[in-house]
UniProtKB/Swiss-Prot annotation:
Record-linked InterPro entries: 3-OHacyl-CoA_DH_CS, 3-OHacyl-CoA_DH_NAD-bd, 3HC_DH_C, 6-PGluconate_DH-like_C_sf, ClpP/crotonase-like_dom_sf, Enoyl-CoA_hyd/isom_CS, Enoyl-CoA_hydra/iso, FA_oxidation_alpha_subunit
Organism, scientific name: Aliivibrio fischeri (strain ATCC 700601 / ES114)
Pfam families cross-referenced by the UniProt entry: 3HCDH, 3HCDH_N, ECH_1
Name the record gives this protein: Fatty acid oxidation complex subunit alpha
CDD domains: crotonase-like (cd06558)
EC nos: 4.2.1.17, 5.1.2.3, 5.3.3.8, 1.1.1.35
Subunit relationships: Heterotetramer of two alpha chains (FadB) and two beta chains (FadA).
Lineage: Bacteria, Pseudomonadati, Pseudomonadota, Gammaproteobacteria, Vibrionales
Disulfide bridge map: none
Binding residues for substrate: D296, N500, Y660
Biological process (GO), any one: fatty acid beta-oxidation
Amino acid sequence: MIYQGENLSVDYIEPGIAHLVFNAKGSVNKLNLATLQSVGEAIDALYSQKDLQGLLLSSDKSAFIVGADITEFLGLFDIPTEELSDWLHQANAIFNRLEDIPVPTLSAITGFALGGGCECVLATDFRLADETASIGLPETQLGIMPGWGGSVRLPRLIGADPAMEVITTGKPKRAKDALALGMVDGVVSRETLITDSVTMLKKAIEGQLDWQSRRTQKKAPLKLSPLEAAMSFNVAKGMIMKMAGKHYPAPMTAVKSIENSAFMDRDAALEVENKNFVALTQTDVAKSLVGIFLNDQLVKSKAKQAIKNSEPVTSAAVLGAGIMGGGIAYQSASKGVPVLMKDIAQQSLDLGMSEASKLLNKQLERGRLSGLKMAKVLSSITPSLNYASIENKDIVVEAVVENPKVKAAVLAEVENEVNEHAILASNTSTIPISLLAKSLKRPENFCGMHFFNPVHRMPLVEVIRGEKTSQQTIDRVVAYASQMGKTPIVINDCPGFFVNRVLFPYFAGFSLLLRDGGDYQQIDNVMEKEFGWPMGPAYLLDVVGIDTAHHAQAVMAQGFPERMAKNGRDVIDAMFESDRYGQKNGSGFYAYSIDRKGKPKKNIDESTAGIIATVTNTTQPYTSEQISARMMIPMINEVIRCLDEGIIASPAEADMALVYGLGFPPFKGGVFRYLDAIGLTTYLDMAKEFEHLGAVYQVPESIKQKAADDECYYPAPQSLSAPSA
């Protein structure tokens, strides 16, 4: 044994050929701080081997290395920048020593080689992959860029243009695509990966493969003329500005880093990468995007626990077809859970099946599923005008019209048809679950299961716990949502649950802003371009449906009269009374036409101003800062109240629900990450300016206390000193 560490070992696989195997105790290999230190120690041990002729790197798991340990990132970002820069120098010295070892080196890649794992294999002379390999540098998706030589070695290996595409998109390449780009030198079967790798290394040792010229290429400047460089980098920067925009600086920073180091050798180029990596770690964007990743892991870990605690759902039913019912049925069937779709109208069943067929056809056209698979999914959706076979279903999702009396009647009816262990779930968006449960004999088997529209695109499912809902029911519905490929978050019952409860104060802020003379187009522009929402409030209301919003607004006002009761007629009333329902009937705040792809196209409607004029007496200019504040304060206050009341369990789950359910700007990380970033005192000062506007602008006492105690919503990252490498 040449070296034995906790996460890797090195020994000879054949005379003269050393084999470094990543073999962490867990299910995957991560290039965490401890493993990186072990890599350095192992390489030091290899340098002392007089009989060494070649080095092979591999993993004993189904993935090579899934990346760095992201749980360590926020702690690293928090250390002084000089210390972080020094540590990066030490880490890169390890990869440089791997690259400079005076024998040929090869990485045998199975499964994921991402982030630091990819940077590790880039430091070897050759890379051989099996068919399962997936190789990439996803750092820009976390608001940073490669920091262990990835932005230096990859452009020199495969060329600037393809390297910039790999780095700026953050999307990994499958084995065959990586081979076409030159990221790997061959693709072989998993069974022969190690033996083929040894054979390839022997060829390099014997001089049949020129490993030294390959190494020289990676350490030299890019082979670009000044004109080629100017064209390449200018085109890349233009595309990045269009793709990523101003809110996500990492892709542009990565391109500029590659550009500025293009004519440098490896060591000088690594200095440029170091400087840019450190700068990105200090941005709120990086902290927010890393925070989202960690929050997502928390939510998934809770779902995994629920899956362990429950039996998998093997058959389901949906009550109420149409577009929503069809979407739920499609999602269930496409993930392997057969579904009965029941409705009282044949026309609705036809619409539901049409929706499922349409979604499957799109998958077929894009090559994401075969005709055979499409037929199998469609055949596992059974449309029915009666309850035949429903007694065998594990779970029944009710998705009928959003009316409490209708829903209660349908739920009571179906409860008599199902077996006593079956779970009933309502897809209501606003009606309290405990209210609907009053019509049931077994309320412990009932909960909310709120999907978002369109079902196939929106990742969030709110699983709502009523007063009498059992934990067993919650666990099984969370497990079913996970089976469907969704992200379930458990919410305690209240009108609107979490997402809609916090959305309607935001709409109230919009109505008040229009009442006070704001311009809806400017508001949309500010909330989209400046704050970062995918849609401004007027456009969002059009997409949701102004009739739907009008009804939900009344439900919310009844549930929270002290804050959400309207003080007179507002713009949503005015639009509703004018039959301006939004995209669904072609006219809302905007007018809609159908483009060549069959999608609604937004156009300015000159008549909208006249309708808005009926609920305002003035026109008044507002700054972007005033608009953002007036729009966001009501939502932020309501989010805080939901946490205070235990409607949502943690800041992490609240932020994920906002990002996944509403499209809250990921670069801001969610409401609680945003509050921590700007500072609670700063928020209180901002809110104080608008407290005269009414109850939705009154900040909860809890945030005042937190600010007084100098606290944050998220715990401070674990303190790390610059690790020794």
